[in-house]
Amino acid sequence: MTRRQFTKVTAQSALLITTFPVKTITTQKEEKSMIRLGGPVFTRYENPDEWVNAIKLLGYRAAYCPVDITASQDEIKAYKNAAKKADIIISEVGVWNNPITSDEAERKSAIEKNIKCLQLADEIAANCCVNVSGSRNEKYWAGPHMENLSEETFDMVVEITRKIIDAVNPTHTWYTLEAMPWAFPYSADSYLKLIKAIDRKGFAVHLDPVNMVVSPEIYFNNGKMIGECFAKLGPFIKSCHAKDIIIREDIYLPHLDEVRAGTGKLNYAVFLKELGKLQDVPLMLEHLNTQEEYKSAADYIREVAKNNGIIV
């Protein structure tokens, strides 16, 4: 086509557009990512309505389980229905014991509590039941031990996790293990190894990236580690913990301290962006002493989220 022919065709097209206006095509604005933030409630509550009000006053859309394993079926049902009506997701039922302890009586009791907590999580429709895999340490129930990362311990974790899940066969929740620096799982790849070995639909991931910062290399590049976790584990993640971490600069061996969100170096921009891609996975604040500290942590997370176009 010559330039003259092009000019003629263009003029004819312009005339057609003038005579027969073309409807403007608009693209729908891309929806913003959304995260459900939650944390402990310091206000006492006696019933589901008071609990919901306490959650709403804090601006949360996720919450820890409001009852424990001693709750009646009527209580569980009432809180479950109240959460659903108020659009609050119950994030998790925490166990926090050592199911691989060498003490036979303690181990049996610990496993029984895991089963009861998983049953509660299933009945109240929490996103997950969460525990740590445990420790061979005789003094500290979740402490370091030279055998924690052995193949023997790995097999123990697999066997006991299967036993817990098979006892309940959950249909409305998942049993999850939170990462620890010196226990399975401790990285994205060790999570994948566990998922494959346990081989149960009822097993999933509870992501706490601070617990996976185990070296200066990971500390200074923790955004990369967080991205890797979501890339490899995304479909399995059911709940996350929100805290922070800082390295001591006044001593000459690596010393990492857990601190309040916003006072450390965890890459929350990456964390929130990746979490925002998932569907209704709660981000739960933890390990603080007062409601004021939780408010400061929540304010920081909301600020980072706002700066990155994420609704909290």
Regions inferred by a protein language model and the residue ranges of each:
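Hydrophobic faces of well-ordered beta-strands that scaffold small-molecule active sites
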Residues: 35-40, 63-65, 90-95, 129-131, ...
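N-terminal twin-arginine translocation
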Residues: 1-5, 16-29
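Acidic-and-aromatic substrate-binding clefts and catalytic sites of carbohydrate-active enzymes
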Residues: 41-49, 65-76, 99-102, 137-139, ...
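Conserved, mostly hydrophobic/aromatic
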Residues: 55, 63, 83, 110, ...
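Acidic/histidine-rich catalytic cores of soluble enzymes
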Residues: 93, 162-260, 265
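Acidic (Asp/Glu)-rich catalytic clusters
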Residues: 32, 52-57, 72-92, 119-125, ...
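C-terminal helical cap(s) of enzyme catalytic domains, especially alpha/beta-barrels
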Residues: 294-311
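Active-site acidic/histidine proton-transfer and metal-coordination neighborhood
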Residues: 10-12, 16-18, 49, 85, ...
